[in-house]
């Protein structure tokens, strides 16, 4: 993916705060290059659908690397409310309650810590159902040793799901399902922030916005143990439901290495190389499409919006 509304950086010197000029016409950015400031470069806006899809893919990669560090006890957990435990806002709409999921995760981790098991991590999101806007939560748990799994009915595509008395003990507000954690389910959890309503919509409906919550350092252990090879190839190989795929190095790892790597010029070289490749790819796509840069971004926005509309729940949550 690529940013569909890149921001122009101008008059930027090393160490100075970044200033932006952003002129928009609808959903597509248009830049007035005749202004009396010097435009040096462009940076991602981090808000458009392209940036949000890139961000969700990065979380999928980081989750997959965390699984590689701890191959056992990784689960995709869905928590739902029973009718009597739904919390309604002033407009009579069922609402997510962040304190509920925070308390659940803290209680679960303390339970295992008292039994000598530490190092449980998570990636969680709150979400509203597509049809009835019913609140529920998805949590990717890493290194969570559930030993009381009970098999439930198979999903409609033939993959196994479970329940756990341990999960029920700490989530007493409704129901839950457990599946095997994969790149697909982690990416799906992160993509809920891509499907979100606009800020004004949440305020108008008085709903808690959909948001990601996570532990620190997801995927960091594997990265630190393999960083030389990863940067040599400048990519990460991940097993997905469509086979082995090559992904970009998550920006989180770049920021980490900027603080820790002594050879900062090497990292600058890698970033410059990436930028040249990205610009060349963009130029080639424009040539093929025979459209202006602005029109090209508009077309890409429409394509990505259609992708977001088709996002579905990952039924591949554990093979039989």
From Swiss-Prot:
Function statement: Plays an essential role in viral DNA replication. Binds the origin of replication and cleaves the dsDNA replicative form I (RFI) and becomes covalently bound to it via phosphotyrosine bond, generating the dsDNA replicative form II (RFII). In turn, viral DNA replication initiates at the 3'-OH of the cleavage site. After one round of rolling circle synthesis, protein ORF2 is linked to the newly synthesized ssDNA and joins the ends of the displaced strand to generate a circular single-stranded molecule ready to be packed into a virion.
Which residues are the active-site ones? 188, 192
Q: Does the keyword Cell cycle apply?
A: no
Q: Name one GO molecular function term.
A: ATP binding
What highest taxon heads this organism's lineage? Viruses
Q: From which source organism is this entry?
A: Spiroplasma virus 4
Record has Nucleotide-binding as a keyword: yes
Instruction: Write down the chemical reaction(s) this protein catalyses.
Output: ATP + (deoxyribonucleotide)n-3'-hydroxyl + 5'-phospho-(deoxyribonucleotide)m = (deoxyribonucleotide)n+m + AMP + diphosphate
The protein's name: Replication-associated protein ORF2
Q: Which segments does the entry list as coiled coil?
A: none
The family assignment reads: Belongs to the microviridae Rep protein family.
Q: Which keywords appear in this protein's UniProt record, sorted alphabetically?
A: ATP-binding, Endonuclease, Hydrolase, Ligase, Nuclease, Nucleotide-binding
Name the Enzyme Commission number(s) assigned to this protein: 3.1.21.-, 6.5.1.1
């Amino acid at each position: 993916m690529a940013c569909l509304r890149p921001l122009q950086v101008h008059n930027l010197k090393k160490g100075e705060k970044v200033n932006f000029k952003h002129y928009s016409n609808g959903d597509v950015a248009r830049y007035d290059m005749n202004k009396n400031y010097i435009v040096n470069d462009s940076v991602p806006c981090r808000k458009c659908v392209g940036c949000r899809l890139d961000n969700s893919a990065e979380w999928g990669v980081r989750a997959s690397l965390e699984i590689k560090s701890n191959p056992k006890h990784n689960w995709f957990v869905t928590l739902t409310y029973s009718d009597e435990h739904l919390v309604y806002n002033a407009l009579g709409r069922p609402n997510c309650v962040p304190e509920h999921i925070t308390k659940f995760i803290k209680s679960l981790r303390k339970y295992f810590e008292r039994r000598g098991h530490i190092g449980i991590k998570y990636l969680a999101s709150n979400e509203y159902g597509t049809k009835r806007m019913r609140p529920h939560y998805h949590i990717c748990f890493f290194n969570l040793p559930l030993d009381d799994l009970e098999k439930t009915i198979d999903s409609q595509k033939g993959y196994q799901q479970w329940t756990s008395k341990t999960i029920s003990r700490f989530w007493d507000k409704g129901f839950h399902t457990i599946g095997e954690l994969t790149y697909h389910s982690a990416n799906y959890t992160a993509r809920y922030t891509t499907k979100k309503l606009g800020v004004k919509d949440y305020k108008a409906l008085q709903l808690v916005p959909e948001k990601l919550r996570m532990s620190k350092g997801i995927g960091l252990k594997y990265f630190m143990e393999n960083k030389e090879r990863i940067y040599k190839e400048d990519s990460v190989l991940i097993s997905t439901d469509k086979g082995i795929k090559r992904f970009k190095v998550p920006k989180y790892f770049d920021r980490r290495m900027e603080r820790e790597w002594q050879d900062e010029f090497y990292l600058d070289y890698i970033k410059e190389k990436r930028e040249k490749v990205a610009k060349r790819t963009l130029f080639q796509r424009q040539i093929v499409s025979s459209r202006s840069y602005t029109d090209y971004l508009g077309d890409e926005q429409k394509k990505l919006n259609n992708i977001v509309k088709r996002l579905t729940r990952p039924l591949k949550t554990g093979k039989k």
